[in-house]
Amino acid sequence: SCMKAAPMKEISIRGQGSLAYPGLQTQGNLDTLSGPNDATRGLTSLADTFEHVIEELLDEQQVIQPSKENKDADLYSSRVMLSSQVPLEPPLLFLLEEYKNYLDAANMSMRVRRHSDPARRGELSVCDSTSEWVTAAEKKTAVDMSGATVTVLEKVPVPKGQLKQYFYETKCSTKGYAKEGCRGIDKRYWNSQCRTTQSYVRALTMDNKKRVGWRFIRIDTSC
């Protein structure tokens, strides 16, 4: 089978401030560019600026992580969100984690990648995947670290009411290339298959004895 992505790591920052976007200044816009060459330079400039912002966020993340003494810190995950409505975008910490994992796998620093061959930006994944927010109402049950099936609670009590639990899940795409095996594998000599893999995240759940608590459960996180 194809190489599987590394499990997502829990990110602990609750109660220690939040990440904020550094000042973002683009170098002109596409409407003011005069020709094809200028357009190419403009797009490259915007891409470099975006990567520079991510680099600063990752550097800041290492500074604001709490100490191990904060018992509530591990309740936060890059793939779990408590919200009154469906999140409109992927979680920022998830995007940072994905980008960092890519750089680690490619053995490159961000500064090196910004100045590398632009053609590398068009690389394709071995397996196609889809990601979306899933509610506890849709998920209903999950498997915890002990192998027991637990009920995922839809709402979490907070001082001013209740918030819903949302999980950002990634799984193999059911369309296109996934049915034919892994991309880049010579089908004449090798059999391959794209498979959805899971990782543990922290969620509010209830076991079969009606005991409610925060437990690590498995969700789909990669293909």
Curated annotation (Swiss-Prot):
Organism field: Acrochordus javanicus
PROSITE patterns: NGF_1, NGF_2
GO molecular function: growth factor activity; nerve growth factor receptor binding
Disulfide bonds: C127-C194, C172-C223
PANTHER family reported in the protein's UniProt record: BRAIN-DERIVED NEUROTROPHIC FACTOR (PTHR11589:SF3), NERVE GROWTH FACTOR NGF -RELATED (PTHR11589)
Propeptide: 6-114
InterPro entries listed in its UniProt record: Brain-der_neurotrophic_factor, Cystine-knot_cytokine, Nerve_growth_factor-like, Nerve_growth_factor-rel, Nerve_growth_factor_CS
Keywords, in A-Z order: Cleavage on pair of basic residues, Disulfide bond, Glycoprotein, Growth factor, Secreted, Signal
Family classification: Belongs to the NGF-beta family.
Domain of life: Eukaryota
Residues carrying covalently attached carbohydrate according to the record: N107
Signal peptide annotation: 1-5
GO CC list: axon; dendrite; extracellular space; synaptic vesicle
Location within or outside the cell: Secreted
Chief localization: secreted
Function noted in UniProt: Promotes the survival of neuronal populations that are all located either in the central nervous system or directly connected to it.
A Gene Ontology BP annotation from the UniProt entry: nerve development
Name of the protein in its database record: Neurotrophic factor BDNF precursor form
